Amino acid sequence: MIYLKTEDDLVYLRESGQIVAKALGTVAEFIKPGITTKYLDQIAEEYIRSCGAVPSFLNYSGFPASLCISLNDVVVHGIPSKDQVLKEGDVVSVDCGALKNGFHGDSAYTFRVGDVSKETEALLRTTKESLYQGIAQSLEGKRVGDIGYAVQEYCQRRGYTVVREMVGHGVGRNLHEDPEIPNVGKRGSGPQLKAGMVIAIEPMINLGTRNIVMERDGWTVRTADHKPSAHFEHTIAIRKNGGAEILTSFDYIQEVLGDRFI
C-alpha cells in the first residue's frame, strides 16, 4: 500500500532528512586514507543520536551497523569493519538512515578517497547526475517508470550499466515502503506519482557488468566482475503542481569537500 503523507508528516520527514544530510557531512570530514569504515560508522551514530534520533539501519533485519559502507566493487550494504581501512584511490559509498518522531530519512553519497582514476570519477559524476535526472521526472501525474527510464537512459548512453535487483522505495514511518522505485523502466508505466508520496531514488550504477553477487554474510552485494560501482540517493516528496521537494541534501558534504565535491 502506498501511504500519502500530510503536511504535518512532511515537517518530521524534513527533519529526519536533514539529520541524515548532516550526518553524511560529518562523515565527509573523515574520508581519507588510514580511516577505518568502523570509525566512520561510529562518527555517524554519535551524530544521529546527538540529534535525538536513532540510526534506521542498526538492527534492521539484523544489520549490525548504523551505516552501509560499500567500498569499490561493493554495490550496497557493505558492513563497516575495524579491519577495513580506506586507502588512496578507493571509492566509498556511505548510505545513512535516521528515525526521529516516527519518520525516516535516507540518503547516500559515494566519496573519493584521495585521487581516483578518471574513468572512476566519470562513473561517480554520471551516477550523481542520473539521480537528478530521475528527480526531474518525479512530478505529480508521472509514473514510476518515468523515473527509472530517465536514470537508465542517462547512464546507458554513457556506457555504464544499471543494477536491476536493488531498487529505491517509499519512505515514511517505515524505512522501506511501497512503491519500489527501480532504476530502469518504461515511460508511462508503473504506479502513478501523487502529491504526498515520499520516495527514495537511488541509482546504483556499475563501470562494468550489471551483474551482482551476494557475499556469504548475506548483506554485502558486489559487482560480478569486481569493477567499481557508485551509489547516490535522495529522499524526495512529490508536491502538488510543482517539482519534487528534496528532503535530504548534499550541501553539508559540499561544505566539507569544497572543490573536491562531485
Label the model's feature ranges:
Residues M1-I262:
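Active-site neighborhoods and metal-handling regions in enzymes and metal-associated proteins
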